[in-house]
């Protein structure tokens, strides 16, 4: 259940009513399900604290990723109004966890943590800027998730994309994949993109793009490579990587073994050395390796501006 509201009268007035609804659901209607409450920028600390006692997750949506973009569209707003509550919630989460260790009766506070959302494509930020922002909030505010939403043109404002402009859904999806790499695959933001490569490749996923730019790190010898290195092989997901580490203790692994484990062989085979023949390694240093892989791999999104987007953002994108 998501509790969301536009601001009316003022921040505290609106936030108080959101908290009242969450409290009523919990105490009067005995609702024990998941509640995600979108906090109101500028609301008091007291209301933020009370919200965390009744909601499973709190979110403060950043919306526009950079201060310059926000100033362009909303000169009267600033990121600090959104960042300050995130800092408060982070400190409250730490405090309640410490109290819980001492007193079992301590109530839960936002047990599912906090999240934020950024709009993609409304202003001129590149993907490098966006994932740097996400990385900052993950590291400094202990966010559980950053959500990315492609901008849907609904206004004739000249500062925004024109009505009828395509929604960049593949770009949105690539950002989710890059986010997944940072959270679960051990990638740093500045490894995925940099100032010389500020946009994510729409033809291949971010892990494949990284591999193609760092071809000297391959092939990975599956039989003795570290888990961290195996996780960087295109086509190998987190679960498959752990299965590989376990399985190789008992036998030398071939492409057929990896396929049974769940590895996406059509991508991984260009980057790994295994027991038995792997004829695809001959393409590793080919100048047109990307074209070979793209031609050999049916894209999940044939049109980068498709009107349909999968709701699943998991490591199946990056296997």
Regions found by a protein language model. Give the residues of each.
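Conserved Radical SAM active-site core
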Residues: 1-116, 120-124, 137, 155, ...
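A structural motif corresponding to the C-terminal lobe/cap of the Radical SAM core domain
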Residues: 81-89, 121-206, 220
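C-terminal extensions
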Residues: 200-229, 255-319
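Residue-level signature of tetratricopeptide-repeat
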Residues: 247-248
């Amino acid at each position: 259940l998501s509790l969301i509201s536009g601001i009316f009268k003022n921040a505290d007035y609106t936030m108080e009513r959101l908290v009242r609804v969450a409290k009523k659901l919990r105490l009067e209607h005995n609702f024990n399900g998941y509640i995600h409450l979108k906090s109101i920028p500028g609301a008091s600390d007291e209301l933020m604290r009370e919200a965390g006692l009744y909601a499973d997750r709190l979110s403060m949506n950043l919306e526009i990723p950079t201060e310059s973009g926000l100033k362009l569209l909303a000169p009267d707003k600033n990121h600090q109004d959104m960042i300050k509550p995130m800092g408060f919630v982070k400190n409250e989460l730490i405090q309640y966890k410490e109290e819980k260790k001492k007193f079992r009766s301590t109530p839960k506070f936002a047990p599912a943590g906090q999240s934020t959302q950024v709009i993609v494509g409304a202003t001129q930020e590149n993907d490098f800027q966006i994932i740097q922002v996400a990385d900052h909030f993950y590291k400094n505010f202990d966010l559980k998730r950053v959500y990315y939403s492609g901008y849907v043109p609904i206004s004739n404002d000249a500062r925004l994309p024109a009505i009828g402009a395509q929604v960049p859904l593949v770009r949105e999806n690539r950002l989710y994949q890059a986010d997944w790499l940072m959270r679960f695959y051990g990638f740093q933001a500045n490894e995925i993109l940099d100032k010389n490569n500020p946009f994510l490749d729409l033809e291949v996923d971010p892990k494949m793009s990284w591999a193609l730019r760092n071809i000297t790190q391959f092939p990975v010898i599956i039989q003795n490579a570290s888990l961290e290195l195996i996780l960087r092989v295109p086509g190998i997901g987190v679960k498959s990587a752990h299965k590989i580490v376990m399985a190789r203790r008992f036998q030398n692994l071939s492409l057929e073994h990896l396929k049974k484990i769940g590895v996406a062989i059509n991508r991984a085979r260009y980057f790994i050395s295994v027991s038995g023949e792997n004829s695809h390694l001959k393409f590793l240093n080919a100048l047109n390796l990307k074209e070979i892989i793209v031609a050999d791999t049916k894209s999940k999104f044939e049109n980068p501006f498709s009107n349909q987007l999968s709701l699943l953002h998991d490591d199946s994108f990056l296997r």
